[in-house]
Amino acid sequence: MKVNLHDNRALKVAMTALAGAVMAACGGSSNPTNDLPAGITPVSATVYPATTAGKGDTAATQDLLTGGIGKTGLGAATPAYADPANPTAAELRRNALYSNYRGILDYSVNGGYGSLYGPNVTAAGAVTTGEGLIPGREYVAVLDDGSGRKRTVIAVQVPDSFNQANPCVVLGASSGSRGVYGAIGTAGEWGLKKGCAVALTDAGKGVGLYDMMDDTVHKIDGTRATRTAAGSLNFFAANITDAARTAYNALFPNRLAIKQVHSQQNPEKDWGNDTLAAGRYAMFVLNDRHGTAANPVPFTPENTIVIAGSASNGGAASLGAAEKDSGGLIDGVVASEPVTEMPTASGYGIQFGGAAVSGYGKTLADYTTYGNIYQPCAALATDAAMSETSIFNYIQLVGMTARAAARCDGLAAKGLVSGADTAARSQDALNKLRAYGWTPDNDQMHNAHYALGNGPILSAMYPVSYGRFPVEANVCNTSFGAVNATGAPVAVAPATLAQSFATANGTANGTPATVVYNVSVGGAKAWQFAVSPSTGVADFGLDNALCQRALVTGVDSVTGAALTASSTPTKAQSDAVRAGIAEVVLNGNL
């Protein structure tokens, strides 16, 4: 996408001049003030002046894009901490930039890093021998709704190259469930190289791990403290009393609460508004820095180009921001693979490779919980078979084949697939996925998509988030925590938790939080090792998957009977989840 910033800005300035002339002709006057946007509390303003790559262990040795380590550092081994058990805020920022950049972009030379893209590649696409550091100032703030549980983090980055004569702002909501630096390698890098201010935000997600055992939290700067010691800088703590927490720990020790899951905010409904708030704060920051007594608000939506752009959930946040932008802040949207929660499958069509596809128009929770039931079985089908040894063939790589076959057996016993053996049952499972919306091009992708945890993680996280359930609810007998090599919940290693702001991605991907099925036969286990009570075998916790599906559909996943007050899950739980899903659908009015 090519954006002509000059032509758009000229039109905006002309309209501003016309509006001013009309007001003057009518005898009106304007006395603009630079007001802090509602709900926003500034936390810090820090200069990151580095232009030469180094260790990046202090603010003075860091820049906005690479944390001071440059193109070479982003492509190298993880930067070390002086004290791994007690990383500093500066070290955590550096490593968060490192992990978030690499978490979205291919950092391998053969993948194009350093030649097609990367800090050393200019905005015009020229490959340089430099390290690509971008010095400037970063303004961190928190957006809250008064509850103390929303706590959306915003980081406005203003490069020293910001052009006051041609102002532009790029809004970068984090992809996935990532923290505030989640879009640094996508929208962030593009905007900084263009000399734009960049407004990064976690959009209400982020790495917020609350340790139920010791009442510790992440602070806004990524360091850890007790809830009390963190005070107003607390990023997230579960809304639970000490007495309730003690009782919970006695039954379910070594568990973690996750911000996106347990904030009881349904943050997805606010992704668009949070992205808009980041944009408004960016305008405030620019005016606060460059405004004068004679002209306190030199930058306005009328003379500043504002682009919202990101990928995945960040792309959805960008679309949501454009839908909710009644004030004309945003000029353009760049959304890569956005999670598009459609309200209907009617009135439009979708083609793939020139051919019409079926099964579209469903929500993320619908697709995810359906796939979570059938994918491990379908991965064994002949049409999905692979012989390669790679991450792509993860079920075979890590020895999950027997458990996947057990999933096929369990589905057959419950009448959810047909066939006399694994070959027939897995083919039926694959056919069901195709009929539900997955194309044959996805046949071999079910293997890694499921076995790496996408289905179990999203099916555990999103329904709980939509339903606004507290951590102690253990919906569908599911919780979250660190686990050992056999999948049993254990205490998080102190250094792991201390570094988690920089290593975790806001989900239950095992770094360090994992999806735990509490009623696995023999004791609570991570989803990979779970033994379902109804089958008595290790089948990736089929019972939990069926329960999570029922939360989304409102009916028993085996019998099709409507949920009741005594069923698992209950009707009330499903009603809450479906109400939350209704809050996140888009309307397409940009």
State the predicted function of each range:
Residues M1-R9:
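N-terminal secretory signal peptides that target proteins for export/translocation
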Residues R9-T16:
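Sec-dependent signal peptide recognition
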Residues T16, G20-I40:
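Bacterial Sec-dependent N-terminal signal peptides
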Residues P32-L590:
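C-terminal His-loop and adjacent cap/lid subdomain of alpha/beta-hydrolase
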